[in-house]
Amino acid sequence: MKNKMLLMLSILFCFALADEFVDSKTTVGGYGELHYDMKGNDGDGKLDFHRFIVYFKHNFNSQWSLMSEVEIEHNMVGSESALGYKGGYVAMEQAYLNYWNGKWGFKGGVLLVPAGITNEYHEPPTFMSVERPEYNKYIIPTTWFDNGFAFYGTMSDFNWKVAFTGDLDGDAIGSGIRSARMKGVSSTTTSWTKTIQGSWTGMTGLKVGGSMTMNDAPTAAVAAVDAVPDSMNCGDDGMSECGNATDAVDAIAMGKVGVSLGEFNATYSAHNIYARMEYGMINYTDNPDGVESSSGYYVDLGYDIADLIGCGEDTNLYLWMRNSSYKKDDAGDAKDISLFGVTYKPMNNLSFKFEVGTAGDDDVMRMGLGYMF
């Protein structure tokens, strides 16, 4: 009885603390999405609650705030040996202090790399398709986040951002950078990942932008560089006095993989028309896999017919299509994607989606729902 009383008092105390610490300055949000994905060639369907995200924001005053986001993917988290199948994962995708004075700002902590449209704005109701564009998985991976800091601001209709985040993993770069994301785990700053982004919003409904991201991604061979002497006096007989200097020089050359990612994007949403496009290209130097570049694009076009069929003032019903193509290795074959879909939004923060089409050699059919708040 005494233990039950202590438990009840503890619960009441927690509610009292919640009233004390969670006030109007603290807000809670989030988003999530459920997918049904079937490839017509094999007839097997997959049902997956792909993402569940909780978002916390606290305003310390009118200029300083804390923003954070925690994600759970694929329902269950755990090792394959423990679950009997490959489980999902938990990640802290964002957690940063933010300063904004109306003209310019600063943020530091766990940040999203400001490259492309979808990496920064990937809540399910903000894009038409059930899944995020496949191009984004392999050319500009989403979600791409790391520890770092950024400065940003506005000048009339022009928005700018400069970000410095942790290195990519040079040993994991092959035909793409998706596997090279460190996600804030033991991040290094041998080169820093540097991103410059700009956008223009001077026309109603239109946003045009682009970015450049650069990093000399360190590899395991970086450790060998420390063993190279500051000077190599090999004497009259070549290598005899300094050992195998050639190996040392090779280690320096192999110590990094150069990555240069450029992208251009545009979005238009007005007068019942929806259009979005993005083109991205990655150039590599000293890539052990021999891949020199990766590139791709996608174009979405849609029209909101809700007014035509009397769906209601706050309702959207989009008929849309997507054309996309990407090459993880520009010396190889492209994967072409064509989709046709319907997206119903009973309100701006909810979406129900259906699409059919082709992805490479596969026929696909997908359904999904998503929310954000």
Predicted stretch roles:
Residues 200-329:
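Detector for outer-membrane/organellar transmembrane beta-barrel domains
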